[in-house]
From Swiss-Prot:
Protein's name in the database: Paxillin homolog 1
Disulfide bond sites: none
Lineage, broadest ranks: Eukaryota, Metazoa, Ecdysozoa, Nematoda, Chromadorea
One GO BP: nematode pharyngeal pumping
Disruption phenotype: RNAi-mediated knockdown leads to developmental arrest at larval stage L1.
UniProt keyword tRNA-binding present: no
Gene: pxl-1
Record remark: domains: LIM zinc-binding domains 1-4 are sufficient for the localization to dense bodies, adhesion plaques and M lines in body wall muscles.
Chain segments carrying region Disordered: 33-157
Any GO molecular function: metal ion binding
All residue ranges annotated as the LIM zinc-binding domain in the record: 174-232, 233-292, 293-350, 351-410
Family designation: Belongs to the paxillin family.
Length: 413
């Protein structure tokens, strides 16, 4: 896969440098190890030869017929040569010379091969006598060192060098839950599984989630945007997902900034909001649109009001429509749908005494285009009440017949 190629290209220079160091170190150790093996085998043979010589000398002194020590020494020398050849063959088989630099794939493949046991090779070293002497050497505490080119030792050294010097971890941490391949390097642990960073993605949009916050739902991983779009409540104002604080009213959810007046789109202040037909309004717009209007000023009524003449009034607006005097709980008079005080009511109807300017509530005298209380309709000269209904008018003033005749009848025209 592309990700595997990128990883191989990234670690290739580090592996090349490390393998070069390993090649040099291995060759030096191999030569030292072979030399040590030969010296140990020679010492073992000399001990065995000395033992045989002593036995031969003892047998001759006892008068026994034995093989000549010169012949035995010659045969032992031949056995020694054969033993050395076997040792060298085994050493060559265990420690082959490094003719070329091993590849990364060959080193990693050796991890799966079982390590070669040193005991199996030691059993094939020469005759029984030499094998026995070699075992004796081991029992004396001189055990040979482990083969430096042993596969598990070499791979372990390589892993340690890569981890300490280059920060590259070559030990698989587990299998990726997405692709099923081993994970070497960075790993994402989520939903109880392990993933390659590039394989742990949103199940909706496919975006990588290794370095981003994510949400889990029914065992599936979602990026923040897709999770909120699918499962978060929606704002009734903008119809987008709500991811933070919200306002819940009338079984609806709103962003705080979207919870505004349906008329002026301004946020609600300390006065709160009012609801009408599923819409929210600020106090000013709600009363302006839906509150009853005062018949006096045509403004919305928001508090106390007076109902009169089939309509509503602010208490301050329910006054005489001519003089503006408040009725103060007293009676009022209506004329053409307007509340009036008594005086202006009678003025509007023409029922004001022309003499006293008082209201005429009962009988009245209509004369000269005016109205009078009966007791106020008098002669302008003698001030007698004109009760008979006959009078004389001079300059819009009433006179009785007597005063008229005395004053105006004798006056020449």
């Amino acid at each position: 896969m592309p990700s595997d190629d990128r990883f191989a290209d990234a670690v290739k220079p580090a592996l090349e440098a490390l393998l070069s160091d390993l090649q040099h170190t291995t060759e030096v150790l191999r030569r030292a190890h072979i030399s040590d093996r030969r010296s140990q085998s020679r010492d073992d043979f000399e001990q065995s030869y000395d033992l045989q010589g002593n036995l031969n000398t003892q047998s001759v002194s006892n008068g026994n017929i034995t093989t000549s020590p010169y012949k035995r020494r010659s045969s032992e020398g031949k056995d020694y040569s054969k033993s050395q050849e076997r040792i060298y063959e085994n050493e060559s088989r265990l420690n082959p010379p490094v003719y070329s630099r091993p590849s990364v794939q060959s080193l990693l493949s050796q991890v799966e091969e079982p390590p070669i046991r040193a005991s199996s090779s030691r059993k094939s070293l020469g005759p029984p006598s030499q094998a026995q002497s070699y075992s004796d050497v081991r029992s004396n505490g001189r055990s040979p060192s482990r083969d430096p080119l042993h596969s598990d030792s070499m791979i372990g050294t390589m892993n340690g060098e890569l981890s300490s010097k280059h920060g590259v971890n070559t030990i698989p941490k587990g299998d990726c839950a997405a692709c099923g391949k081993p994970i070497i390097g960075q790993v994402v642990i989520a939903l109880g599984k392990m993933w390659h960073p590039e394989h742990y993605t949103c199940c909706e949009c496919g975006a990588e989630l290794g370095q981003r916050p994510f949400f889990e739902r029914n065992g599936r991983a979602f990026c923040e945007e897709d999770y909120h779009n699918q499962f978060s409540p929606k704002c009734q104002g903008c119809h987008r997902a709500i991811t933070d604080r919200c306002v819940s009213v009338m079984n609806k959810n709103f962003h705080i900034e979207c919870f505004t007046c349906a008329e002026c789109n301004q946020p609600f202040g300390e006065d709160g909001f009012h609801e009408k037909n599923g819409q929210t309004y600020c106090k000013r717009d709600f009363f302006r649109l839906f509150a009853p209007k005062c018949n006096g000023c045509s403004q919305p009524i928001t508090s106390n009001f007076i109902t009169a003449l089939g309509t509503h009034w602010h208490p301050d607006c329910f006054v005489c429509q001519h003089c503006g005097v408040s009725f103060n709980g007293a009676s009022f008079f209506e004329h053409n749908g307007a509340p009036l005080c008594e005086r202006h009511y009678h003025e509007s109807r023409g029922s004001i005494c022309s003499q006293c300017r008082g209201a005429i509530n009962g009988r009245c005298v209509a004369a000269m285009g005016r109205k009078f209380h009966p007791e106020h309709f008098r002669c302008s000269y003698c001030n007698h009440q004109l009760t008979k209904g006959t009078f004389k008018e001079v300059d819009r003033r009433p006179f009785c017949h007597k005063c008229y005749n005395n004053t105006y009848a004798l006056t020449p025209a």
